[in-house]
């Protein structure tokens, strides 16, 4: 009869009697399970978790491939952005959705009781909460009627977390007024707990009606602009309508809309045909939209593979320990079998012991996962795209840890249990009586196989660590196209405080001039788009005298900059001139392009003096200069086609300032903050960082993968060394009499050392060979994560192999040295 309580007592009693075994096994499992749990938690939050909304499987995300016209907000990639008129047409004319919503992430300057802070939030359509099926914890949500007239409903809904954090969870804030971007807004509700919008990893603090767009973003009157692509659109399919059916219906509906837009925008026949070829796709939307998913998804999958290998190594290590433990208990097991105990009964007891170990390792693993999660958060950038990532395990993560622990217990416990109970009773009792260590050659072969597995997996992790470290080194030393040393930056967004365009230009110019005169500052300038920040503002253009090719992409990156920008950044001017203070609002419109732009559109011709049109501007802009290519959005990018405009001739909402210092740039932080406060004490300053810090932040995923792979590789190597040491020590004990006989017959210590080390080398060589072949075969899986280094790089493989070989030889040397000290008389005592 099965008695689980008795099995548990037996397991705990046995583990208490072997404290060293228990501690080593728990540590091995805790590290392996903890690492897997931590990476799974990150993967779950970034890639797997469904939105906490009603029936998330019914949600779809709108995307459209093909040429676009006008300005595109590409925080999430330009295929996911649409104009408000497009959204309105989709919402009012479709027959396959029960509702369509639109949203746009935005930052706000929030004032409450004379305290001002910068908060993140979403502009949302009036039906946003209804379509998602999200309710208010207190108060109410927006209504579709509040989505009709621009500026008519100055309302705001707070997220539950922000309400708790900023207002102490006081229900009395309902119907109170806060100030957002210099506009009084009435709090009408608190969103339900756990709802953080539809942006993966984000944590919007406030939700504002879409019709408040112009009030929240002065000078952005794009609610009627067909060419301003800025909205994400989600739809909820009607019951019984599949995603494919919805997509087909929407493309049929969209075609006349595209034709009408092309006609309104006065496209040429060729461009109109290209524009009308665009295809609308409905993607699964139940997991939300992520601005960082493309960047982190592949890296997280690689990390998950690495921690999987680490767990296999830990399992092999514990299995080795269990086999050694079973060898020491062979006499006990044989006697119990001889007295009538069934083999199934003993296997069950041994498996219960393994499961107790695994669950204990799982509990320890939760602590390791939380510590690892806290360390992971330090790598993440401090921007809205990652604000919602948490290190705290939720129910899904706890369930994952439990299931993984049980599976691990069975995985490392079943083979040792079968091996331990498969024994020849007579020979085992005879060997034990004569002092021979139990287990036989079968145990030794199995343990060697496990160590070979550990060596192979450890080397694979070491090779991966070397490749990612080399790739990170290449990224950090890549030519960015500008000088990164002694450069500090910060950003301001006066539009959030109600500044007009004229007032903003005046502020920007005063800041640029005053900062440039500060002690310790050599030169200063500014740009609207922060370098290497991941932001990408693009627009479509037409060039006078240039005939675009069929399906040619005419979108280019654009930035609005101040005088001296290229000199401050150290970007060489290749032709023409730089902008000056004379390039003001009333001066002729000018533009500077980079060499990639000039080479693509003009070839060997001189671009200076050529003219460009973009957006709806009737006036053309004259190219007055050409600058060298550089990294703009991220370090991995190929050179973009870039155009630069004088900020004084453009509409701007915010500005990033750059200062080239004569001393360590970080010491200038307080000085820069004080200068901004002198201009406006209520103007928030953010993203104050050196360019080195900006680069590190932009490489957060590369740094994370490199650091974790190095840690996993080192840990795996340690576990492999422990396993190899244990096997060789066991082998030496089993062959004590053989070694004694050899020494009695004249073998010296060097020969004995060579005998044992030959076994070490054999195990290491087999494991290394398997690892090298596997790494060569699987290298293509991580090649996309590497920069300027092949996944089959011979130098990395050689360095990793040498490292593991040295560790293996050191691990085997200690048992070999012990073998040379065997006393032949003692070894032969039982012969």
Where are these regions (language model features)?
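Membrane-proximal extracellular/periplasmic loop immediately following the first transmembrane helix
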Residues: 51-107, 229-232, 264, 475, ...
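Mid-to-C-terminal secondary-structure elements
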Residues: 121-144, 153-298, 374-378, 464, ...
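Interfacial "coupling" helices/loops that link adjacent transmembrane helices in transporter permeases
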Residues: 314-358, 436-437, 722-764, 768, ...
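Small-residue-rich transmembrane alpha-helices
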Residues: 39, 319, 355-428, 470, ...
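Membrane-helix entry/capping segments
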Residues: 1-21, 53, 115-116, 149-151, ...
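Alpha-helical transmembrane segments
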Residues: 31-65, 372-381, 457-486, 729, ...
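Alpha-helical transmembrane segments of integral membrane proteins
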Residues: 1-22, 288-292, 321-348, 352, ...
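Short, strongly hydrophobic transmembrane alpha-helices
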Residues: 18-46, 50, 313-315, 358-362, ...
């Amino acid at each position: 009869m099965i008695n689980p309580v008795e099995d548990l007592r037996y397991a705990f009693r046995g583990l208490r009697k072997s404290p060293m075994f228990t501690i080593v096994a728990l540590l091995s499992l805790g590290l392996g399970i903890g690492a897997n749990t931590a990476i799974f938690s990150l993967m779950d939050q970034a890639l797997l978790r469904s939105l906490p909304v009603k029936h998330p499987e019914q949600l779809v995300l709108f995307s459209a491939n093909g040429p676009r016209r006008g300005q595109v907000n590409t925080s999430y990639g330009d295929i996911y952005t649409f104009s408000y008129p497009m959204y309105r047409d989709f919402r009012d004319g479709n027959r396959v959705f029960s509702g369509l919503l639109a949203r746009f992430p935005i930052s706000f300057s929030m004032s409450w009781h004379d305290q001002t802070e910068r908060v993140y939030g979403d502009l949302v359509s009036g039906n946003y909460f209804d379509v998602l099926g999200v309710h208010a914890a207190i108060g109410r949500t927006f209504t579709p009627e509040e989505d009709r007239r621009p500026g008519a409903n100055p309302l705001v809904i707070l997220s539950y977390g922000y309400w708790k954090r900023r207002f102490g969870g006081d229900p009395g804030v309902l119907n109170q007024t806060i100030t957002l971007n210099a506009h009084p807004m009435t709090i009408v509700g608190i969103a339900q707990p756990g709802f953080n919008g539809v942006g993966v990893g984000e944590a919007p603090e406030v939700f504002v009606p879409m019709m408040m767009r112009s009030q929240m973003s002065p000078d952005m009157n794009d609610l009627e602009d067909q060419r301003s692509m800025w909205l994400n659109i989600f739809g909820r399919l009607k019951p019984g309508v599949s995603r494919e059916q919805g997509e087909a219906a929407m493309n049929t509906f969209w075609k006349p809309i595209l034709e009408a837009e092309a006609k309104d925008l006065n496209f040429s026949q060729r461009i109109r045909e290209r524009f009308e070829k665009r295809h609308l796709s409905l993607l699964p939307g139940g997991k939300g939209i992520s601005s960082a998913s493309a960047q982190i998804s592949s890296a997280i999958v690689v990390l998950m593979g690495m921690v999987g290998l680490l767990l296999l190594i830990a399992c092999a290590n514990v299995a080795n320990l269990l086999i050694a433990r079973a060898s020491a208990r062979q006499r006990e097991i044989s006697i119990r079998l001889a007295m009538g105990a069934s083999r199934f009964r003993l296997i069950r007891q041994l498996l219960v012991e393994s499961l107790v170990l695994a669950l204990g390792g799982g509990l320890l693993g939760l602590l390791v996962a939380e510590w690892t999660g806290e360390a992971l958060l330090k790598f993440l950038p401090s921007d809205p795209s990652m604000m919602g990532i948490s290190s705290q395990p939720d129910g899904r993560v706890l369930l994952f840890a439990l299931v993984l622990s049980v599976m691990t217990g069975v995985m490392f416990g079943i083979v040792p249990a079968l091996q331990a109970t498969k024994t020849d009773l007579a020979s085992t009792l005879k060997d034990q009586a004569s002092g021979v260590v139990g287990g036989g050659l079968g145990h030794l072969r199995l343990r060697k196989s496990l160590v070979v597995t550990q060596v192979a997996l450890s080397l694979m992790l070491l090779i991966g660590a070397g490749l990612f470290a080399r790739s990170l080194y290449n990224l950090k030393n890549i030519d960015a196209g500008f000088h990164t040393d002694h450069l500090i930056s910060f950003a301001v967004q006066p539009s959030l405080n109600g500044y007009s365009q004229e007032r903003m230009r005046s502020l920007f110019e005063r800041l640029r001039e005053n900062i440039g005169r500060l002690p310790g500052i050599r030169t200063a300038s500014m740009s609207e788009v922060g370098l290497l920040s991941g932001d990408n503002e693009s627009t479509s253009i037409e060039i006078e005298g240039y005939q675009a090719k069929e399906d040619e992409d005419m979108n280019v990156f654009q930035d609005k900059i101040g005088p001296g920008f290229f000199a401050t950044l150290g970007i060489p001017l290749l032709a023409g001139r730089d902008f000056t203070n004379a390039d003001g609002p009333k001066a002729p419109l000018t533009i500077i392009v980079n060499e990639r732009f000039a080479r693509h559109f003009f070839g060997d011709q001189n671009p200076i003096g050529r003219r460009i049109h973009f957006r709806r501007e009737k006036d053309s802009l004259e190219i007055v200069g050409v600058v060298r290519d550089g990294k703009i959005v991220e370090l991995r990018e190929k050179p973009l086609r870039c155009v630069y405009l004088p900020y004084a001739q453009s509409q701007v909402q915010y500005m990033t300032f750059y200062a080239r210092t004569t001393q360590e740039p970080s010491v200038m932080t307080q000085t820069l903050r004080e200068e901004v406060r002198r201009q406006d004490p209520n103007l928030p300053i953010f993203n104050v960082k050196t360019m080195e810090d900006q680069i590190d932040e932009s490489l957060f995923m590369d740094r994370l993968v490199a650091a974790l792979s190095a840690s996993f590789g080192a840990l795996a190597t340690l576990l492999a060394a422990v396993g190899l040491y244990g096997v060789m020590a066991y082998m030496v004990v089993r062959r004590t009499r053989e070694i004694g006989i050899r020494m009695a017959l004249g073998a010296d210590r060097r020969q004995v050392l060579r005998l044992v080390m030959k076994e070490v080398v054999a195990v290491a060589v087999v494991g290394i060979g398997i690892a090298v072949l596997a790494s060569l075969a699987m290298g293509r899986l991580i090649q996309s994560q590497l920069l300027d280094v092949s996944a089959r790089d011979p130098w990395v493989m050689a360095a990793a192999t040498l490292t593991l070989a040295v560790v293996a030889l050191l691990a085997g040397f200690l048992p070999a040295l012990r073998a040379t000290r065997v006393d032949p008389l003692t070894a032969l005592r039982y012969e």
